[in-house]
UniProtKB/Swiss-Prot annotation:
Protein name: 7-cyano-7-deazaguanine synthase
Residues that, per the record, bind Zn(2+): 189, 199, 202, 205
GO BP annotations, alphabetical order: queuosine biosynthetic process
Annotated ATP binding sites: 9-19
Native organism: Ralstonia pickettii (strain 12J)
GO molecular function annotations of the record: ATP binding; ligase activity, forming carbon-nitrogen bonds; zinc ion binding
Known role: Catalyzes the ATP-dependent conversion of 7-carboxy-7-deazaguanine (CDG) to 7-cyano-7-deazaguanine (preQ(0)).
Cofactor binding: number and manner: Binds 1 zinc ion per subunit.
Family: Belongs to the QueC family.
Classification of source organism: Bacteria, Pseudomonadati, Pseudomonadota, Betaproteobacteria, Burkholderiales
């Protein structure tokens, strides 16, 4: 029987690449997305298409409305998504504890289906402003996962994989192209419309556009 992995899948470029990488590593992949009240909800439609295209065994979308807490431009309509260029520091698009919340959901599903590997698209190179995308965070969460689960206590080590954490956006795109990822299916924009068309000026769009240019790969993104 093939080993199983839970892959966090937002519908964006990074997580699509990570799903393809997990497949290439020989895993039977289970894709997990979250409807957390993000204003760019069209990314979930993208996630469905990516999961199907890359052959995930299952794709689950969990509802957990983080708009009740606010604190991020992605979940609070009173906060504007920045469009004036990438700044230093933790950006207002940081969703409080989002990766911890999503990895915890993935960890629960992993135990339920006998998976011992979690994959997610943390990246600390092109955009290092998010505290839950750092290598030390990944290592700390893996420690927690093995302390907090039946599988971990019984010696079936759980691994938290962040295969693109030290890659540039161009390197990620080039790797995905080699693995057959159709980036035209993905949505990265923080302000994408209901059709998945990108604004072209938010931080995520700027980084994505620069990545395709640096990679020498045609940008398939649909812009408003």
């Amino acid at each position: 029987m093939k080993k199983r992995a839970i892959v966090l899948l937002s519908g964006g470029l990074d997580s699509a690449t990570v799903l393809a990488m997990a497949n290439a590593d020989g895993f039977e992949t289970y894709a997990l997305s979250m409807r957390y009240g993000q204003r760019h909800s069209s990314e979930l439609e993208a996630a469905k298409k990516v999961a199907a295209a890359l052959g995930a065994v299952r794709h689950e979308i969990v509802d957990l409305d983080l708009r009740k807490f606010g604190g991020s431009a992605l979940t609070d309509d009173a906060l504007d998504v920045p469009t004036d260029g990438v700044q230093s520091g933790i950006p207002i698009t940081y969703v409080p504890a989002r990766n911890t919340i999503m990895l915890s959901l993935a960890l629960g599903w992993a135990e339920a289906v006998g998976a011992r590997d979690l994959f997610f698209g943390a990246n600390a190179v092109d955009y290092s402003g998010y505290p839950d995308c750092r290598p030390e965070y990944v290592a700390a969460y893996e420690t927690l996962a093995n302390l907090a689960t039946k599988a971990g206590v019984e010696g079936e080590r759980i691994r938290v994989n962040a295969p693109i954490i030290n890659m540039t956006k161009a390197e990620i795109i080039q790797a995905g192209v080699r693995l057959g990822v159709d980036y035209g299916l993905t949505v990265s924009c923080y302000k994408a419309d209901d059709a998945g068309r990108a604004c072209g000026v938010c931080d995520s769009c700027r980084i994505r556009k620069a990545g395709f240019e640096a990679a020498g790969v045609p940008d398939p993104t649909r812009y408003v």
